[in-house]
Every structure is written in structure tokens, then in C-alpha cells.
UniProtKB/Swiss-Prot annotation:
The enzyme can be inactivated by further oxidation of the cysteine sulfenic acid (C(P)-SOH) to sulphinic acid (C(P)-SO2H) and sulphonic acid (C(P)-SO3H) instead of its condensation to a disulfide bond. GO terms for cellular component: cytoplasm; cytosol; endoplasmic reticulum; mitochondrion. The active site is a conserved redox-active cysteine residue, the peroxidatic cysteine (C(P)), which makes the nucleophilic attack on the peroxide substrate. The peroxide oxidizes the C(P)-SH to cysteine sulfenic acid (C(P)-SOH), which then reacts with another cysteine residue, the resolving cysteine (C(R)), to form a disulfide bridge. The disulfide is subsequently reduced by an appropriate electron donor to complete the catalytic cycle. In this typical 2-Cys peroxiredoxin, C(R) is provided by the other dimeric subunit to form an intersubunit disulfide. Residues 82-240 form the Thioredoxin domain. GO terms for biological process: cell redox homeostasis; extracellular matrix organization; male gonad development; negative regulation of male germ cell proliferation; protein maturation; reactive oxygen species metabolic process; response to oxidative stress; spermatogenesis. SUPFAM superfamilies: Thioredoxin-like. This is Peroxiredoxin-4. Homodimer; disulfide-linked, upon oxidation. 5 homodimers assemble to form a ring-like decamer.
Length: 274
């Protein structure tokens, strides 16, 4: 009888523990599920952070030594309206031309090729070297029915002050190409070169043909300027293909061999080359 009583007591105690475990299991499972979910969210967040980071801009800001990683959300490259072989985004604004303020728009250049380039800011370092280089060789562009316009987010008043600053003091001096003002940043955003975190643009260069179609895009990080020689070569190459229908191989220059773009025609070029 005593043994039976002990057995019953043990069974009762076991049942009590079982009931307690049953009551404890749901909160425990919920805790484990929440922990796993939080770990998954942290992993997803780390992935999204890496995904949203763009390449490292060596120059960071306009000033050397301020390098920083720029996220995709901080510039408008992914929102650009500028598409190769499509009409260039329309723009209009106030420019400084021969020391005067004048209204300028993209359609003013219909019937001509246009080299339209952005630079970060007035009164900086690489920027004046580029503008002066293009301005000093403007006649070479004009001789091939091409104009050049430079643009930044500075006001037309800042442009004029920079032009009135002697070159030996970092100014432009008399300049032979228009400086367009994009004070509200709309043009820069449309062309995908505006850096939201910095408040200025990358070094973007766009070649627009005589029909208003965008033919070429160059985007430089901030520390390195662009080449006038290469820009001239590209304009000449596109004009050649427009006129003759043949295509230009790597490094093509006026007078060099071109390629007839069909299976039989290309063999003439490769036979000469090899």
C-alpha cells in the first residue's frame, strides 16, 4: 500500500512537471524564433549596407585628403535621364558669355555638336585647368562644327568673379567658352552627376550630336581632369561614322583605317592589320 502511494505521488509529480513544461514551451519557442528573426534582420541590414555602397571615391570631396565612401543614395547616377543614343536631357539657364549674363539653352546648339561638361566648383584646383584648356582650344572645336559649354552649381555672379580673377591667382581670366549656372542643381541631377552629400557634381562630360542625341558620356572622380585631345578625337570619330557609316576601331584618329560593319567588309580591315 505504501509503495502504491509513493508510485501515485511520483506519477502526480511527473504530471505536474509535464504540465509546467507544456506551459513553458510556447514562450521558449517564441523567444527562439524572435532571436533567429533578429539575427536575420541584422544580416539583411549588413547586406543592404554593402549593396548600397558605391565604389570608393579616391578624392572624396573637392579637397584632397577628404576621401569617404559614398553610398548610392548620395549621388544621382542611378536617376540620370542621360541615356546614350537618346535625346540629351533639355536644359536652359543663365550663363556668362564674354563677360555678360545671357540666357542659354540646349536647343541653341541644334545643328552642331556640343561638348557639355560639368565641373565641381569655381575657385578650386583642377577645374580652372580644364576650363582654360578647353577655352584655349575652342577654335579646334569650332572648325569641326562643335561648341563647348561648361557648367557648375555656382551662380552666374560667382562665375563672373572667377573670370575676373587673374589666372596667376587661380582665376580664369578672359575665357572663350560659356559658363552655365545650375544653381538649383536640376541640370546636374538630370545628367546624373550631382553628389547630394557634397552639394556639387562629379566631372561629367557629354558629347551631344547635331540632332540633339547623346553620343558619349565620361565621368571622372574628382581629383583627375579630362583630356581635350581625347574629347576632340571622340567628336571626330562620331562625325566620321555619321558621314561614312563605317565604324572606328580602338585609338582611331582622322586618316586612320576604319571598319565596314558587315561580316565580309570587316575582313578588309583585319587583313591589312595582320
Amino acid at each position: 500500500m505504501e509503495a502504491r502511494s509513493k508510485l501515485l505521488d511520483g506519477t502526480t509529480a511527473s504530471r505536474r512537471w509535464t504540465r509546467k513544461l507544456v506551459l513553458l514551451l510556447p514562450p521558449l519557442l517564441l523567444f527562439l524564433l524572435r532571436t533567429e528573426s533578429l539575427q536575420g534582420l541584422e544580416s539583411d541590414e549588413r547586406f543592404r549596407t554593402r549593396e548600397n555602397e558605391c565604389h570608393f571615391y579616391a578624392g572624396g570631396q573637392v579637397y584632397p585628403g577628404e576621401a569617404s565612401r559614398v553610398s548610392v543614395a548620395d549621388h544621382s547616377l542611378h536617376l540620370s535621364k542621360a541615356k546614350i543614343s537618346k535625346p540629351a536631357p533639355y536644359w536652359e539657364g543663365t550663363a556668362v558669355i564674354n563677360g555678360e549674363f545671357k540666357e542659354l539653352k540646349l536647343t541653341d546648339y541644334r545643328g552642331k555638336y556640343l561638348v557639355f561638361f560639368f565641373y565641381p566648383l569655381d575657385f578650386t584646383f583642377v577645374c580652372p585647368t580644364e576650363i582654360i584648356a578647353f577655352g584655349d582650344r575652342i577654335e579646334e572645336f569650332k572648325s569641326i562644327n562643335t561648341e563647348v559649354v561648361a557648367c557648375s552649381v555656382d551662380s552666374q555672379f560667382t562665375h563672373l568673379a572667377w573670370i575676373n580673377t587673374p589666372r596667376r591667382q587661380g582665376g580664369l581670366g578672359p575665357i572663350r567658352i560659356p559658363l552655365l549656372s545650375d544653381l538649383n542643381h536640376q541640370i546636374s541631377k538630370d545628367y546624373g552627376v550631382y553628389l547630394e552629400d557634397s552639394g556639387h557634381t562629379l566631372r561629367g562630360l557629354f558629347i551631344i550630336d547635331d540632332k540633339g542625341v547623346l553620343r558619349q558620356i565620361t565621368l571622372n572622380d574628382l581629383p583627375v581632369g579630362r583630356s581635350v585631345d581625347e574629347t576632340l578625337r571622340l567628336v571626330q570619330a562620331f562625325q566620321y561614322t555619321d558621314k561614312h557609316g563605317e565604324v572606328c576601331p580602338a585609338g582611331w584618329k582622322p586618316g586612320s583605317e576604319t571598319i565596314i560593319p558587315d561580316p565580309a567588309g570587316k575582313l578588309k580591315y583585319f587583313d591589312k592589320l595582320n
